Structures are given as structure tokens and as C-alpha cells.
Amino acid sequence: PTLAVRNGHNTNQAKGYSYLYWKDFFNPRQQLCLGLLLREILKIKNKKIQEQFLCLFSSTLEFNNSFCSYKGEGTGAVRPIFFNHILKPERTPLENSVWGEPQSSGCFSTLYKTRFLKAKEYLNYPFEIKVNKDNNKYEKVISSQPLRPIFVDNWNDLTNTNDSVWVLNGDSARLPIPDNSVDLVVTDPPYFDYIHYSELSDFFYAWLSPILENRYPEFQADTSERANEV
């Protein structure tokens, strides 16, 4: 990645330690290994599958950089870069294995099993967690039929197509849907100024924008910052 670190609340924390480009967050060996992995992902001809693996690659970045450390004392799991939402370098950074092996933490091969395959399994067997009050144990309860949504890109198709889903990524203050058409709103509350998502998302944007800029206009900007964001 060649993207420079822009000024900001969180990014200035790293710039104070002379981390001026996002590539500086990775040592030369990590840059090489991640670059080789990314090159192989880009050989996948099916773009939908390729982009799923690009999402998995972005998760791998969190656990393979110079800001990682051990979780807890001793040689435990790998603690990723954003575990405490600041960009302060570790005194003794932990260098992880990019590809990994069965007992690894935060590696591409293990994240493939724990995140990618788990998500696919959930689509086939959606579940809820039930708590047994007698022994305080948890169990999974299959809660619906397999999820096989049909993705649409407008309101008319959404209302006229069974089992359809319309995914929007934009300004929630101006949704292109009719008034009084929403039955339920489920929201994840923001953290106000605790986490500066736009600044921190440049960590991933630096790797993905050169690949996706010719597919999606949203990736053509120099950074992930947008003029109308809060």
C-alpha cells in the first residue's frame, strides 16, 4: 500500500511515532507474505468469490501487523491492532504467521474456518442461543429455514420479489424508501468520538482501494473520508 496516513484524532497517535504511510504498519516480511497472499486471491476469476476472500484478507490484516501483541500473559492468542481503538505501537510487537497452522490465532487459514466457514454454516442453519437456567449452559437452537436471499437494488423489486434483500451503504438520514414503510429498526449505537471509524478504516482501504477502484467508484478517492460523514 502506498497511501499516506492522513491527519486525525487516532491517526496522529501513530504519526507521532513516525508511522507516516500505512505500509509502515507492516514489516518487510509481512508486506511480502501479505502481498503474495493477495496476489493469489486476485487470481480467483469469479469476482463474487474473490471479493469474499478479499474480506477475509482484510481480517487477516488486523492480526498481521506491527501493532499486534499477545492477548493476556504468555503465548496466548494474538491481540489485533484495534483491540483498544488507538494507534499506539507496541513496545514488543508480535509477528504472527500470515498463513498459519491448525492451532494458530488470527491467521488466514484459521480465520477462514472461524469466520468465513462459520458465516456460511449460519446461512444454512440459522440459530439462536438458548440458556438452560438449571445448569447455566448454552445451546444452539435452529431458528429458521436456510437463508437464501435474492439481492435486489431498488424498492420496487424488494416489495415484489419473495425472499429478497436490499443492502444499502449510504447516508441513513436519507434512505430511498417510502415514508411509514419500516416495521422495525435494529441499530448498533455509535461510540461518539471514542472510535474514529473513518480514520481507522484507511488501514484496510490502503490495501483494497487499488484493487477495487475500477469496480466501484467509492474506492476511487484518495482516502475513505467522505465530506458528508459525521
Please place each PLM-identified region on the residue numbering.
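Nucleic-acid modification enzymes, centered on SAM-dependent nucleic-acid methyltransferases
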Residues: P1-P178, H196-V230
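Conserved SAM-binding loop
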Residues: P190
